[in-house]
Design a protein with these regions (language model features):
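N-terminal basic, amphipathic alpha-helical segments
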Residues: 1-140, 344, 348-354, 424, ...
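Conserved core segment of the aminotransferase class I/II
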Residues: 315-379
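Conserved PLP-binding active-site segment of the aspartate aminotransferase-like
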Residues: 335, 410-415, 432-471
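Conserved core of the PLP fold type I
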Residues: 147-281, 293-294, 299-310, 462
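Short beta-strand "wing" residues that participate in macromolecule-binding interfaces
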Residues: 67-68, 175, 433-435
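Conserved glycine-rich beta-strand-loop-beta hairpin in the small C-terminal domain of fold type I
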Residues: 363, 379-389, 399-412
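Conserved active-site segment immediately N-terminal to the catalytic lysine
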Residues: 300-320, 341-344, 446
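Short beta-strand
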Residues: 66-68, 399-404, 438
Length: 474
């Protein structure tokens, strides 16, 4: 059962952890079974008891083992024995509220936007003229009172039904209505999850760079973020596993479709492997999927959602806010029914429940012509992306990551980094972009919102990017 440790292959205690985990997964150690004594394990691994204790303590902190005073260490029967695959022990914690905190750079952007010739490629919304033309229903007060009777703790029932039908038809989702909670946008959904899942000071792994670093809600909940680099297929799982072991990661947040800010799409294999890794360590996944509606390719050719691979251990966050503008915040969470009820309770306690007016308006979005309107938006975005990629093909300095959907493009270069001084100078000269250091990583990259470009603005964009290239090469 136990193999001698190879001291040349990394920390001894981590190799011990891996062997114990594999024996649990293979069934050599059953749920509730007592492990050999520390002395016997030290002899089996040919190491000292101090190293054994460290490995066992780490596994206890991860929830894999339990300790009984005077009796030894046991495989966690609650987590590993009750279900065929380990399910997450979701916990309730309802505390702080979320308040947005603006930084100095965003304040400069706000001031610069008052100038008529300012090219705003920083903002996170599409321009109003691209938003679908939705006709909202007119209701009398008596009708509103009648509709209000259809409100549940999970949301306005007709809206819940529409979202369920849409996700089932478009993305082949399979879930019951009691597994969906309507929220005030995607950010509130994430906030509720953090409040229910984590304790103050807990660690969360995110992709790096990531827009999650821009959200003040992590500060509000006392969450510590650990950035995990990405390669062409998505989040680096080898580095993620080391971070789970070292930093006691309690949740993994990913943005797998048209990742913000890079626009990358996580490969199907990487999604499968991510689920396996997080099952191994009993770490829940939060899948933030607010851009999947804006794919430039057919759904059949896109990777399946991470949630569909492991519905019990993955929480899925979706949103209509990108398509309705910042004034109409609509989002949802899909997950295990017991957790959804707890999230609904938290939402109610914190008075975050949505008004009936907003939910009726959102329900109107899912009319029969919605698919056609959404297709029009996608076509317009794809045309704009082609303008940008055509510009990129002529570049010797800037590179643009391939654009497959969404409305963000990630522009990189070799050489000098985008300092705060250069970014400020660009704003002063009429160009607003989002530098990589806003997303938790100081790399040579900027995010641009290409939905705000057109033929005329591309000319201005090309000129100002040429000026930026000069500053970066100076």
């Amino acid at each position: 059962m136990w193999k001698e440790i190879d001291k040349t292959k990394g920390p001894i205690y981590r190799q011990m952890m891996d062997q114990i985990m594999k024996n649990i997964e293979n069934g050599n150690l059953a749920p509730g079974e007592r492990l050999p004594s520390e002395r016997k394990l030290a002899a089996a691994f040919r190491t000292n008891r101090t190293t054994v204790v460290r490995a066992l303590d780490e596994l206890r902190d991860l929830g894999v083992l339990t300790s009984r005073q005077g009796s030894g260490r046991y495989v966690n029967q609650t987590e590993w024995g009750k279900f065929s695959v380990p399910r997450i022990n979701w916990r309730e914690l309802f505390s702080q509220r979320y308040e947005q905190v603006d930084d100095w750079y965003e304040e400069r952007i706000k001031e610069a936007k008052k100038q008529p010739d300012f090219l705003d490629l920083f903002s996170s919304e599409m321009p109003n003229k691209l938003l679908p033309d939705v006709q909202f229903p007119a209701h009398t007060m008596a009708e509103m009172i009648t509709e209000e009777q259809k409100m549940t703790d999970l949301g306005y029932l007709p809206l819940v039904e529409k979202i369920e039908g849409y996700l089932s038809d478009e993305f082949q989702f399979d879930f019951s209505r009691t597994q969906l909670l309507v929220t005030v946008g995607g950010q509130q959904a994430i906030f509720l999850i953090l409040q229910t899942l984590l304790s103050n000071g807990d660690a969360v792994a995110v992709e790096s760079p990531s827009f999650f670093y821009r959200l003040a809600l992590f500060r509000a909940t006392g969450t510590r973020l650990f950035g995990i680099p990405m390669d062409d297929e998505g989040i680096d799982l080898a580095i993620l596993e080391k971070s789970i072991q070292k930093n006691k990661i309690k949740a993994v947040l990913v943005n797998p479709n048209f990742q913000n800010p890079t626009g990358k799409v996580m490969s199907q294999k990487r999604r499968n492997d991510l689920v396996v890794l997080c099952r191994k360590y009993q770490v829940p996944i939060v899948e933030d999927d607010v851009f999947s509606d804006l794919s430039f390719q057919e759904v059949e050719k896109s990777p399946v959602s991470i949630h569909s691979l492991d519905p019990e251990n993955v929480l899925y966050v979706g949103s209509l806010s990108r398509l309705l503008g910042k004034t109409t915040k609509i989002g949802w969470i899909i997950g295990p029914q017991t957790l959804i009820f707890k999230l609904a309770k938290a939402q109610k306690m914190m008075e975050f429940s949505m008004s009936i007016f907003t939910q009726i308006a959102a329900t109107a979005v899912f009319e029969e012509s919605y698919d056609a309107k959404l297709a029009l938006v996608r076509n317009q975005l794809q045309e704009k992306s082609l303008l940008l990629q055509k510009w990129a093909q002529k570049q010797n300095f800037f590179n643009v990551w391939p654009i497959k959907g969404g409305y963000y493009a990630w522009v990189t270069w070799e050489g000098k980094k985008m300092t705060a001084e250069i970014a400020s100078e660009a704003v002063a000269k009429g160009l607003g972009v989002a530098p990589s250091w806003l997303f938790g990583r100081e790399t040579n990259g900027i995010r641009i919102n290409f939905s705000r470009l057109d033929q005329d603005r591309m000319i201005v964009f090309a000129k100002r990017m040429e000026e930026l290239a000069g500053w970066l090469q100076a």
